[in-house]
């Protein structure tokens, strides 16, 4: 094993651990955010506004993080993002105690910025690995969400009980958990993410010359006119839209059917397990079979999830449907991320990937806010129908792209 390979392995492991801790925090908060919104908002239709603000802030900060990562490095940028998340969680805790809906929005805005920084870590893992291992590297980082799923489920109820025991609201437990996990993650990144992936990625680019030229960076507008890039961004953006549309409202749907908090955590955990556990094989499948087939399969699974979700309000059927929702998202997300990374030179990656995450976040923020209004005016079934129709767009678009210009298998 060469020095570069050892460094790449170490960086991937550090990013995996960071993703595990951060995901546990985000998942713990995600199950509670709509419930907290419904509790503090003056209008029930605004229940998902905190989630929309969270997603929107992540979207608008994604491009900025791309520039920041190029300027100060991946390590310093991710640490800065986690510190903002710690502050955001502290504000939400104050908001719960003071019943301030505005403070909740500000706190979740900061947490959205944190999520944007952490999510770009998957591209840092890709850039330090050779082209034929990038799918597996991205999957390895995304796989940290499996640990996050288990960790959030294990901590959720005990920490909520602890919050109550010290005189805090039960809902505060999720944000206490997230604050602590972000703090641990920040220390691990600051100490362990050395040398910086930005610098390692430049060395890897010299060792593994690619078809994409290494000279002057193309404008983002030009890159996003390429068929493969359009396909990748569409898969990620609309896969995220379908997932968010159903996931964000499921907690409220279950509360309306008198489910316990433990039931809600179980269903959300099944969903996040579906999001992250398939990364064990999805990266290998991407590198072996090609990006397009996996994205196509993911879009089809999303459609199945949309059909299954409204069939029953019971925990088991909902858990299965939400697991499928996460599985379809995983294939679209990892497949799209890898396909996009394939199209970019080292000098184009951070900014283009930041722009991609902006588009993905913007789309998911819009559907998050829309879901609140749709749910208040109708029901869960209508949301599932809307999401199902949207899932057809990437399905047919990827199929068309594969027929017109199939991407050669990497490796």
Predicted regions and their residues:
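Cytoplasmic helix-loop-helix junction between adjacent transmembrane helices
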Residues: 108-144
């Amino acid at each position: 094993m060469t020095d570069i390979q050892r460094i790449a392995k170490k960086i991937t492991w550090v990013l995996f651990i960071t993703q595990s801790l951060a995901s546990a925090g985000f998942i713990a908060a995600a199950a509670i955010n709509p419930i907290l919104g419904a509790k503090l908002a003056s209008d029930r239709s605004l229940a998902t506004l905190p989630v929309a603000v969270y997603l929107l802030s992540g979207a608008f900060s994604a491009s900025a993080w791309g520039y920041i990562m190029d300027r100060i490095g991946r390590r310093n940028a991710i640490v800065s993002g986690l510190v903002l998340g710690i502050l955001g969680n502290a504000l939400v805790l104050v908001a719960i105690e003071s019943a301030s809906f505005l403070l909740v929005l500000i706190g979740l805005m900061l947490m959205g910025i944190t999520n944007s920084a952490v999510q770009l870590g998957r591209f840092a893992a890709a850039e330090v690995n050779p082209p034929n291992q990038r799918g597996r590297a991205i999957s390895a980082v995304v796989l940290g969400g499996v640990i996050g799923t288990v960790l959030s489920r294990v901590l959720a109820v005990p920490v909520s009980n602890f919050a109550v025991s010290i005189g805090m609201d039960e809902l505060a437990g999720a944000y206490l958990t997230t604050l602590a996990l972000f703090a641990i993650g920040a220390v691990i990144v600051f100490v362990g993410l050395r040398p910086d992936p930005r610098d390692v990625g430049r060395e890897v680019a010299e060792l593994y010359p690619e078809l994409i030229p290494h000279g002057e960076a193309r404008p983002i507008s030009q890159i996003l006119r390429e068929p493969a890039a359009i396909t990748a961004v569409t898969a990620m953006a609309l896969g995220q839209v379908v997932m968010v549309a159903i996931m964000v409202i499921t907690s409220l749907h279950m509360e309306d059917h008198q489910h316990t908090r433990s039931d809600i955590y179980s269903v959300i955990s099944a969903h996040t397990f579906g999001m992250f556990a398939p990364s064990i094989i999805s990266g290998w499948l991407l590198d072996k079979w090609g990006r397009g087939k996996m994205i196509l399969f993911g879009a089809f699974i999303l459609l199945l999830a949309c059909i299954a979700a409204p069939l029953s309000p019971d925990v088991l059927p909902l858990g299965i449907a939400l697991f499928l929702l996460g599985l379809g998202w995983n294939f679209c997300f990892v497949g799209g991320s890898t396909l996009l990374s394939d199209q970019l030179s080292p000098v184009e990656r951070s900014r283009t990937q930041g722009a991609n995450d902006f588009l993905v976040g913007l789309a998911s923020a819009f559907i998050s806010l829309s879901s609140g209004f749709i749910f208040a005016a109708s029901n869960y079934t209508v949301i599932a129908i809307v999401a199902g129709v949207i899932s057809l767009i990437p399905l047919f678009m990827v199929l068309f792209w594969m027929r017109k210009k199939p991407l050669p298998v990497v490796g």
